[in-house]
């Protein structure tokens, strides 16, 4: 998520009274004319009956949003002599101004502050409600204000007084933040899943290497439950990733109370979601589901119920980790590096190939599964069929100690995932950390060498299974992750065999 720094200028001269705003402005920015007219009158700084021209540069970039209200008000106040104009040259400010002169919260402050930090302003002025985002960006001198009067007081104050005001604002925000009870996210434990050892193994491999996973099986077999358990074994985000994800949610207006996102996103759109909801839509696009799932999991429940066009737009971000959008206002690139987790039934009724229960005709099954295109399935690293668990399993080992038992619950699985990620990090030392599922073909040759026996095995298996070159690369990546989970430095035939087992995409038709 990239932002740019814009400059606001004003000229007040004699002439017919008017208020002109220029600089390729969206309607949201132009509407500030009436908001500021009322709010400035509210603080006894009414607009003069003269010709007022406000310019926003660079003029070649579309300006949108309400964040320009506060800087526009400040330059008008400076032109009226209410604040020293020289103080504004090194001041960066954003915020929406209400009719009562209150400063309201705006979206995208975190990303904007990262861009402004490159220009080294002396002071930063943002809405008080966004102060949590400001405090998250290093040690910037960020002041959160609640009203235009407070903003004027801050600009007119001395350096020592400004520092005191910043400390007071930070203390007020911290005290309010402590009063807010953070919603506790309870993630189900894998130990609650009985008789699903194969699926749990696939989930652990997927979490360890950031691989895409497809689950197939009849209704009620635990596919959705397994997906809900997956966040509990994912590794924690680094500080850089927290900033990156929080900037996305800030731009989307979904950052609660201005606090940084601490857990990896788990995004689960409804199967009726449109292409624009998935990728991001609007004249000036907002982040879509694929971007909100950045650095986390995009879970598509009832995957075959999605429209084929909606599923096919996932192919580019699955390969490149970002989504390219072309709109009338320009081209946009949003991050979209997610782990895709899909769950689907094998047919419309869900019970194919059990002909005692399945009511579907063969052509209905083919049409249903045709929504999952070949190129999309080819990008799924792991495929796992989940069968009906015998009912007696539900009454076995239900005591509380079973949840934390060794090699069964989320605690042990998470430890294994973290150890595998450490091995990947050590292997990539001196270079940017890359999960096995994100390795490029060149990096596969570097980090995933195969011996002669392993090469011959993979060649024979790929010919029998009809694997594409991309499919072979994905098998090697999964095998590398399996070897990491077992603490092995080199990929063996047994690791390739297990990767090929989970590569079997006939699980949708068996």
What kind of region is each of these model predictions?
Residues 122-127, 141-145, 213-216, 236, ...:
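Short hydrophobic alpha-helical runs that function as membrane-insertion/retention elements
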Residues 100, 300-307, 350:
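Catalytic P-loop NTPase motifs of RecA-like helicase/translocase cores
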Residues 25-33, 46-48, 55-65, 285, ...:
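Basic, amphipathic alpha-helical bundle interface domains used for macromolecular binding and assembly
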Residues 4-12, 278, 381-388:
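Short beta-strand elements
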Residues 215-254:
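Walker A/P-loop
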Residues 204, 259-260, 265, 276-298:
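Conserved alpha-helical scaffold flanking the Walker A/P-loop in AAA+ ATPase domains
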Residues 295, 301-302, 313:
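Walker B catalytic acidic pair
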Residues 1-214, 224, 471-472, 490-493, ...:
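Peripheral, non-AAA+ core regions of ATP-driven protein-machinery
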């Amino acid at each position: 998520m990239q932002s740019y720094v814009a400059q606001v200028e004003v000229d007040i001269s004699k002439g017919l009274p008017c208020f002109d705003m220029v600089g390729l402005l969206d309607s949201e920015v132009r509407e500030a004319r009436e908001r500021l007219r009322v709010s400035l009158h509210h603080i006894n700084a009414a607009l003069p009956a003269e010709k007022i021209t406000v310019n926003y540069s660079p003029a070649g970039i579309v300006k949108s949003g309400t964040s320009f209200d506060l800087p526009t008000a400040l330059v008008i106040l400076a032109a009226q002599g209410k604040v020293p104009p020289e103080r504004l040259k090194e001041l960066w400010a954003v915020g929406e101004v209400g009719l009562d002169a209150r400063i309201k919260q705006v979206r995208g402050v975190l990303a904007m502050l990262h861009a402004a930090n490159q220009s080294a302003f002396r002071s930063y002025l943002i809405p008080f409600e966004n102060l949590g985002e400001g405090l998250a960006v290093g040690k910037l001198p960020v002041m959160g204000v609640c009203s235009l009067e407070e903003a004027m007081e801050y600009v007119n104050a001395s350096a020592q007084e400004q520092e005191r005001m910043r400390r007071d604002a930070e203390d007020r925000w911290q005290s309010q933040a402590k009063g807010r009870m953070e919603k506790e996210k309870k993630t189900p434990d894998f130990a609650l899943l009985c008789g699903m050892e194969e699926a749990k193994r696939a989930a652990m491999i997927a979490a360890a290497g950031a691989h895409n996973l497809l689950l197939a099986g009849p209704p009620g077999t635990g596919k959705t439950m397994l997906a809900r358990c997956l966040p509990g074994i994912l590794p924690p985000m680094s500080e850089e990733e927290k900033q990156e994800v929080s900037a996305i949610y800030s731009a989307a207006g979904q950052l609660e109370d201005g606090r940084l996102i601490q857990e990896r996103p788990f995004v689960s759109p409804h199967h009726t979601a449109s292409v624009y909801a998935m990728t991001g839509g609007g004249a000036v696009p907002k982040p879509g589901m694929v971007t909100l799932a950045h650095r986390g999991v995009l879970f598509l429940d009832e995957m075959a119920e999605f429209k084929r066009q909606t599923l096919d737009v996932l192919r580019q971000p699955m390969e490149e980790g970002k989504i390219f959008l072309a709109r009338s206002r320009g081209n946009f690139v949003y991050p979209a590096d997610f782990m895709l987790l899909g769950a689907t039934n094998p047919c419309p009724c869900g019970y194919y190939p059990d002909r005692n229960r399945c009511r579907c005709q063969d052509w209905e099954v083919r049409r249903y599964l045709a929504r999952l295109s070949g190129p999309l399935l080819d990008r799924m690293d792991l495929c796992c069929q989940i069968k009906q668990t015998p009912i007696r399993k539900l009454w076995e080992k239900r005591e509380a100690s079973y949840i934390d038992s060794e090699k069964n619950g989320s605690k042990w699985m998470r430890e294994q995932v973290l150890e595998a990620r450490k091995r990947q990090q050590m292997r990539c030392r001196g270079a940017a950390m890359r999960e096995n599922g994100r390795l490029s073909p060149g990096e596969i040759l570097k980090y995933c060498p195969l011996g002669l026996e392993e090469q011959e095995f993979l060649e024979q298996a790929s010919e029998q299974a009809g694997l594409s070159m991309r499919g072979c690369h994905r098998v090697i990546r999964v095998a590398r992750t399996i070897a990491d989970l077992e603490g092995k430095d080199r990929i063996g035939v047994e690791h390739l065999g297990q990767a090929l087992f989970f590569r079997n995409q006939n699980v949708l038709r068996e």
